[in-house]
């Protein structure tokens, strides 16, 4: 049913230029090749999945299928567009920003100018801490929950997102 698909009306714009890629680093917009270590992690993960079987238990099923997190990568980090339900509600209060994702209604809590959470604490969407650089909210996220590894990221995975109001 194509009614529900959210194709968008134009490609992404970055620094005033329309882009066909959401990657801004490297400048060519292409995903860098996997390192040897990443290729090995992918191979080991695939072997583990195959050895357990598709229905060995709930832990072998995707988080979205278990209604723990949104489908695709819309809840983030990083928050990337998917096929539909790409709307976000952003609410700011003293010390916090909350981003509510339309898809599955994930609520991402971002603390502003805060200290990191204890090392053992690993929320589903990671530990997001933000600060303002002028009109841009810069969000640094680390400590993703091991079950929510973004694209086979390691435990030391960190990501920086920048949110700027455009209108």
Map each language-model feature to its residues.
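PEST-like low-complexity, intrinsically disordered acidic/proline/serine-rich tracts
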Residues: 1-167
């Amino acid at each position: 049913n194509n009614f529900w698909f959210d194709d968008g009306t134009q490609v992404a714009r970055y620094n005033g230029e329309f882009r066909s890629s959401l990657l801004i680093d490297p400048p060519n917009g292409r995903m860098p090749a996997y390192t040897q270590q990443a290729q090995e992690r992918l191979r080991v993960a695939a072997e583990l999945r195959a050895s357990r079987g598709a229905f060995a238990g709930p832990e072998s099923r995707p988080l979205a299928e278990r209604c723990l997190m949104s489908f695709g990568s819309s809840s983030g980090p990083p928050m990337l567009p998917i096929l539909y339900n790409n709307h976000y509600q952003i609410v700011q209060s003293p010390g916090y920003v909350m981003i509510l994702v339309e898809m599955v209604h994930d609520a991402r809590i971002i603390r502003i100018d805060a200290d990191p959470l204890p090392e053992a604490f690993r929320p589903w969407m990671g530990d997001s801490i933000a600060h303002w650089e002028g009109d841009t909210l810069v969000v640094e996220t680390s400590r993703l929950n091991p079950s929510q590894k973004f694209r086979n990221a390691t435990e030391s995975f960190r990501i920086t997102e920048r949110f700027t109001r455009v209108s």
